[in-house]
Each structure stands twice: as C-alpha cells, then as structure tokens.
Amino acid sequence: MGEQTTISDSKGLFHKEFPYVIPPVYRKVLDEYLVELNLLSNQSNFKIDTIFSYGLIISFERFTVGYEPDSHISKILESLCNSCNIDIKAIKEYSNNIKKLINEKGIKEIINILTAEIKKSVGGIALSNQSGKDKYYSRLHAIGIYELISNINEDKKEGDDKEIISECVEALGFSKDRVEKDINQYKNSMEKIKEMMELIKLTVEETKRKAKLN
C-alpha cells in the first residue's frame, strides 16, 4: 500500500487535496471513513478486494445523500482514498465488477466467485485461519455483504436474507458475530441519516416559507 501514514498525516493530505468547507452534518462520517481507511492502509496484510470495495462505494453514496454541491462527492471519496494510499481506481473497478455480478449471477455463484477472489487477494491463505487474529477484516466488508444481499434480485437469492448472509460470511471466513454487529450498526446509522435528511428538508422548507411571508 506504500509508506505508512498517521491519521494526522492523512487528514492533512485530505484537506490539501480537498480544500473546501465540509458541512458539519457530514464532517463526522467523513472523519470516520478517513480513520478507517488510514488504519487499514497501514496493515501489511490488508488487500483491496471486491466485497470491501463495494461496501466502501455503496456506503459512501448512502452517507453523502444530500451533500451540496453534489459535484464534490466523487472528489471527496477520491481525496479520502488518496490521503490513505488506497487505490481509488481499483476500488471503483472492483465495485463495478460486483454490480455486474449482481445483475448476471445467482447468489450462490456470486459467493463462490467472491470466496476465490478474496482468498487470492491474501496470497491463498484461507481467511478462516485468520478470522479475529488480524486486521484484515473491515466493517466495510460487512457492509459490502449486506448491500450485496439487499440489492440482488429476489429470484436469484435462493433463501432469506439472514440465511444468505450467514452462508456468505462463513464462506468468506469472517466472524459471524462481528459481521452481524457491524451490519446492525450500519443499518442503525442509515436510519439516523434518513431521519437527519428529513429534518434538514423540513428545515429548508420552513425557511423558504418564512422568507415568502416576509
């Protein structure tokens, strides 16, 4: 991944590459992405893979809904990745690949493909031998799994979401408890984002209404 950088270094690089004011409502979540990516980039056995990339791209899109100007969104992600020595080009390519799989394959076939792809990305070492023993796993893997299952066509799922997630987690060698915890946290965060956006919308509408009265 290149030379190691501290979180402070990454923050400095990020703000140098993205020298714009970030609205307070988005600042915390972007800081969390920066910390996560920085920590992962400093792990010698961390390798970018498809499910991680998909989790990063999709969650970032969801957490930046309503960001203005929207033309800044892609630049923010690019700057976050660059500041942490993460290859944004590879991230986008992997994410696009999984989107194609979702449209073309059944869930079991996708799981088989992802299992082979992820194991290959860590030098052929079975992830089940590493689960809970290193920093390879990221909550973005859990998000990638959750979004994969959520977005695949119902007729290609071959089971309910909970069973499929469990099967996928086991095949990839991750800790079921850890993935379940991260998925629940993600779902809760998404609900808070939804409520926040509704509040912002109502506030904007009320401001416009008062402006018209004046």
Swiss-Prot record:
Parts forming coiled coils: 175-212
GO BP annotations listed: photosystem II assembly
Entries under InterPro entries matching the protein: Thf1
Pfam family, one: ThylakoidFormat
Keywords assigned: Coiled coil
Family the entry assigns: Belongs to the THF1 family.
NCBIfam families per the UniProt record, alphabetical: PS_II_psb29
Function summary: May be involved in photosynthetic membrane biogenesis.
The protein's name in its UniProt record: Protein Thf1
Originating species: Prochlorococcus marinus (strain SARG / CCMP1375 / SS120)
Record gene name: thf1
